[in-house]
């Protein structure tokens, strides 16, 4: 994705005229769905029980036992190399301390490993991008679905900013709101108005947006719970709430131009009791190979067992932060005293550097893709890179991970960016990758348009099917058959073959989100570039209902029981009720 593209505004589409009659959007949708084969359809809707182990020492994988493990070659000055996967050449890496000094042999004091995504947090809600370390969520709880309709429950006006040649209204990619049902001790400690502090059902919306403000709202009503935190410079990505229920927010700055005023890049740490920033990581970093750009679009993961935050950056570094956090609810105080190390790396095709997607974690193994198309795996404990493969183009979409009896796999897709700029193939590649080896299992290609301002291809994170959908993974592909159009398709996890493919009249950068209902069924939500939110049946891809959010909605929604929250280019945050 281009780092400072002109943002295109889409006209509102509240109603259309079809056959001389004014009809609702849903009634005259021109989207078409083409069904395919479904040979691996599950016979049961049950999801196997997951391990609840959270001890990093027990979860950690012995790196030398991994299939195809190759010992690193020592190159001197703390630099190490390993061979690329399925192509010639080597990649290298180095680890730096917070004073930009090379660490010759990084030997951390403790192991860092994540458990099953159900163990990422005990706090109800959606606390990071797609909810957990596998990035397979985005929805919490179950919705009581009766009418299969959507209804706007509340709206919160928000602002905009402009930069040189760019316009940023409302919220955009990835822009997922955070929804958190605070523990009582945290709720009481934050200095909220009594009607929220004393309400056991209170759930808060925490939403960093383009205008450089963090909004805090009541999920039920949209009412402000505290004044917005204003850092002056815009957020593009998604923040993270501390998974222990501590009143700490972590969020990266995606824009440094506020109406002509240029500011510093920072990854920001917020104390939600004081309602202010208390620490930050500068984006322009001497250890980086990309010295001119310092944005942070990634949504951090926090390992609550070891008090460790991990955040990839657009400067090409990966930051590992020992938070040294303390929370005293009785004293109404929270503090951090961070210590950090930084991972720098490059592969044979590295030129641009920078990571815009959010890291995925399986035990002590972590995964990301970068602007040069490098998909790689590193160890969260030692920060050594274990394997790397090149996907052929920029990958901004966060991948999703699944552990199965057959292995551990990643689902990922790239966009048409670098190849389009150099006259190369204008194809988006969707892949299934073996997470332990980096080997490709299958690939599905879709032609997509190139535009340096608005990329085509995969920008949204795929939705991984579970239960009755466990044979499919759903991808959203932008700008396929025409510059304004797109496709959403369900692929068979085993083969990569199409289960269904839905042509979308208006393309989407938003991530499709699956939620559970009390009736035992699953439903899907996706938004598009004309501001339409679609409630669809993930079994078939067909719409059940739609509603207009005014303008382009490229942010990804979050869902808490019957409430959906997302903001659009119409400069509003919406609370939408599932009826």
For the regions a language model picked out, list residue spans one by one.
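Bacterial N-terminal signal peptides that target proteins for export
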Residues: 3-15
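Predominantly extracellular/luminal regions of secreted and cell-surface proteins
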Residues: 117-142
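C-terminal motif of bacterial Sec signal peptides marking the signal peptidase cleavage site
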Residues: 24-27
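Extracytoplasmic/lumenal domain signature
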Residues: 53-112, 136-173, 178-251, 255-296, ...
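Bacterial lipoprotein signal-peptidase II cleavage site
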Residues: 29-37
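Post-signal peptide N-terminal segment of mature Sec-exported envelope proteins
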Residues: 36-61
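Hydrophobic helical h-region of N-terminal Sec-dependent signal peptides
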Residues: 16-22
